[in-house]
Structures are given as structure tokens and as C-alpha cells.
């Protein structure tokens, strides 16, 4: 399953549309005013289905993930010198990025790819392509991309 994650050009807060391969909107992400990033994910019927919320006052960035109101885990940036690395405590996944922070791989505990993330270059807004190998993992993979993008925006 392929998703295209596109930040809206004119928006006061973080706001994204997520499209499937047919160009249909499958998710909408709306940022809220808060300390740190707080991103709410809505399905195509405008039902809130998930949240990514930044923990504040941590040494390295951490984001909590919720499905509905249920806490499912945390994504934490790990200290690394040359390429970004993130740990996910909910399902044993791990994220490795390249030096330029354009491409990422999400792998499970067995070293198998769960999803790949690629940033499209030469776009006015942040645009990512997410290739998810199991469609059931699409929402969780989207949450991880949101956390990575929010962490990058905080540094820039």
C-alpha cells in the first residue's frame, strides 16, 4: 500500500492530507496549539482515529502515539552522529534514516521491512511517500512519519 503524505501550503498549524495511490484522501492530519507538537489524525469521514503528541522536557525528542484514546506506544529519537535513528516501544519496530534524512526504513524485530519512507525533493511543502507492506500497519506508519517530520521541523 502506498500513501502520499503532503503538508498543506497555507496553514497556521501543522496540517496534512494523506492520499492513496488513486489520489483519494484517506487521512487528514490537523495540528493543535499546545506545548510541543500535537497532531490529530482523522479518517475520510472526519472521525478522529489517532494522535501523535510530543513529550516535552526530554533530552531527546519523544512522541506518544494513541489510537483513539488508547496509548499504544512511544517513538524516541536515539543519539547518533551521522544518520537519524528512532526506537518504537509499542511493537518492536526500529527506524533508520539516511545521512540526508530523506529516506527511512521501518524494520521489525526480525529485520524485515515493514515500510519505507521517502521525502520528495523540490516541493513547496513537506511531501513523503510511504510504502507499507501490510495495509494494517498503514496508520502506525503514518504516525511515525508525523513524528519524524515534527522532530525535523523543531530542529529547523
Regions found by a protein language model. Give the residues of each.
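Intrinsically disordered, low-complexity proline/glycine-rich segments
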Residues: 1-156
Amino acid at each position: 500500500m502506498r500513501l502520499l503524505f503532503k503538508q498543506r501550503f497555507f496553514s497556521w498549524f501543522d496540517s496534512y492530507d494523506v492520499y492513496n495511490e488513486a489520489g483519494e484522501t484517506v487521512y487528514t492530519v490537523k495540528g493543535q496549539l499546545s506545548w510541543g507538537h500535537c497532531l490529530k489524525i482523522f479518517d475520510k469521514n472526519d472521525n478522529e482515529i489517532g494522535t501523535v503528541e510530543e513529550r516535552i522536557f526530554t533530552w531527546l525528542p519523544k512522541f506518544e502515539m494513541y489510537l483513539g484514546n488508547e496509548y499504544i506506544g512511544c517513538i524516541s529519537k536515539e543519539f547518533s552522529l551521522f544518520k537519524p535513528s528512532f526506537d518504537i516501544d509499542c511493537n518492536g519496530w526500529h527506524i533508520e534514516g539516511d545521512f540526508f534524512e530523506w529516506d527511512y526504513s521501518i524494520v521489525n524485530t526480525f529485520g524485515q521491512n515493514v515500510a519505507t519512507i521517502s521525502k520528495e525533493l523540490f516541493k513547496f511543502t513537506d511531501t513523503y511517500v510511504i510504502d507499507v507492506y501490510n495495509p494494517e500497519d498503514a496508520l502506525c506508519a503514518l504516525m511515525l512519519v508525523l513524528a519524524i517530520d515534527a522532530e525535523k521541523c523543531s530542529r529547523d
